[in-house]
Amino acid sequence: MTQNIDTSEVEKFADLAERWWDPKGEFKPLHIINPLRAEFIASRVDLKNMDVLDVGCGGGLLCEALFDFNGKISGIDAAGPGIEIAKRHAKDNCKEILYRDITAEELVDSESEKYDVVTCLEVIEHVPDPQSLVTACSNLLKPGGSLFLSTINRNPRSWITAIVGAEYIFNILPKGTHEFSKFIKPSELASCMRTAGINLSETKGMFYNPLTHKANLNNDLGVNYLMYGKKPKN
């Protein structure tokens, strides 16, 4: 089986697993941007009866939001405790979602199932090999399928905003959540998508205000951004 995980990253999120669904806890920013992310995806693809896979699903925030758009949702993550939280929360809320403790690369190696939509949001900056992850996501897509990615740009502004501001000044993220060297420029992520056989359709910036705790999509790719691409039909 192919491994593309940073053990320290997995342990970091495993330790926080019990707090995934606390809207005022360490994952508060994700709770705030989650509806925005789900609506962005659902506005580009009609999810009704679509087979959707969320890679790096954590405690299941995005999976449950996409379930509400009538998709057939699966989630995978390498941090086992988070998967258990996701399973429990989905069951408690009567949402039929399939969760597995496995990486995208391992899933490619272990089964032939393909998906109409693959999402991988706020995950790429936590793995050693971004290209391997994007390629695995592409390999899990059906021909004509849609891929949604999001991450953080790498520049002085993103260091000030996403690390200094978010982790040390406003304390909206636990210290050590991000490593600047793992941030990815949009041009680099677009190159990863092309190498993986994905045609880039759209890129949007995402702004989170740490004072008002409001978020919106825009055309500023300076810090957080999303990419949407399609796999050719043949």
Spans of model-derived segments:
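Acceptor-substrate binding/catalytic loop of class I
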Residues: 171-188
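Conserved SAM-binding loop
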Residues: 38-45, 50-159, 186, 227-229
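N-terminal, positively charged/glycine-rich alpha-helical extensions of SAM-dependent methyltransferases
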Residues: 1-21
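Conserved SAM-binding loop and adjacent beta-strand
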Residues: 22-41
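Conserved S-adenosyl-L-methionine
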Residues: 198-209
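Short, flexible, mixed-charge acidic loops at enzyme active sites
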Residues: 158-168
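Core SAM-dependent methyltransferase catalytic element
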Residues: 214-234
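Substrate-binding/catalytic lobe of Class I Rossmann-like enzymes that use SAM or dcSAM, i.e.
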Residues: 190-196
